[in-house]
């Protein structure tokens, strides 16, 4: 939230808080009943997801109001939380995700399966924010040669021009720069 406050102090933002079920039930094995209908076991349906989500929404709304941040709330507590989040990214300029806490109730080690899914499938740039936020001094951008990675890099520059003066490091899963698709063009873009 400190990052959003910092950006909002420079340029007013509209913050959409997306509140998901604490578990993505689509990743949980379901029992198959008569006629192939998938049934969730009773023990799985007895949880306090809605109470937890509503509590988090209240904290979010109060924090936004206290800081003068315009906001919207999107509550997606259906059984396919990650799919709902991916759908939200189609209409977002930027997705901010806690690099420490994203679905840590399911798997503590980050990046966990859920975070990896979001990073692969998001339809807007994704920014991982640590819980002990400090103003960034460096930008780490990822590039895999795909059109979407170039688009995300360009969007980052358009959306957060105040970070463009930082040292920028381009990360790629490719072993050597000669193997990097369109190396000279991506180097020029991030220069």
Residue ranges and their predicted role:
Residues 71-76, 104-107, 148:
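Short, flexible loop segments at the rims of nucleotide/cofactor-binding pockets, characterized by
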Residues 1, 83-133:
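Gly/Ser-rich helix-loop-strand patches that form or flank binding pockets
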Residues 4, 56, 60, 114, ...:
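A general structural detector for well-ordered alpha-helical segments in enzyme core domains, enriched
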Residues 46-47, 102, 173-177:
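Short histidine/acidic/glycine/proline-rich micro-motifs that form metal-
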Residues 15, 20-23, 58-95, 191:
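Structural beta-alpha unit
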Residues 39-54:
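A short acidic, glycine-rich active-site loop
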Residues 1-41, 121-124, 134-191:
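Small/aliphatic-rich secondary-structure junction motif
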Residues 74-75, 129, 142, 171:
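Active-site-adjacent beta-strand anchor residues
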């Amino acid at each position: 939230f400190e990052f959003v406050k910092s950006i909002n102090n420079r340029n007013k933002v509209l913050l959409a808080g997306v509140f998901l079920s604490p578990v993505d039930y689509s990743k949980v094995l379901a029992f198959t009943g008569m006629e192939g209908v998938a049934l969730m076991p009773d023990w799985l349906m007895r949880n306090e997801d809605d109470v937890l989500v509503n509590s988090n929404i209240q904290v979010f709304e109060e924090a936004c109001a206290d800081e003068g941040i315009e906001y919207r709330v999107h509550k997606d507590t259906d059984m396919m939380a990650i799919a709902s989040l991916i759908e939200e990214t189609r209409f977002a300029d930027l997705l901010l995700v806690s690099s420490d806490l994203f679905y840590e109730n399911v798997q503590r080690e980050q990046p966990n399966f859920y975070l990896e899914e979001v990073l692969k499938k998001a339809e807007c740039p994704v920014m991982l924010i640590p819980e002990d936020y400090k103003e960034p001094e460096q930008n780490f951008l990822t590039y895999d040669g795909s059109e979407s990675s170039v688009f995300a890099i360009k969007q980052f520059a358009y959306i957060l021009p105040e970070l463009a003066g930082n040292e920028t490091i381009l990360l790629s899963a490719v072993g050597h720069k000669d193997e990097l698709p369109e190396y000279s063009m991506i180097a020029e873009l991030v220069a």
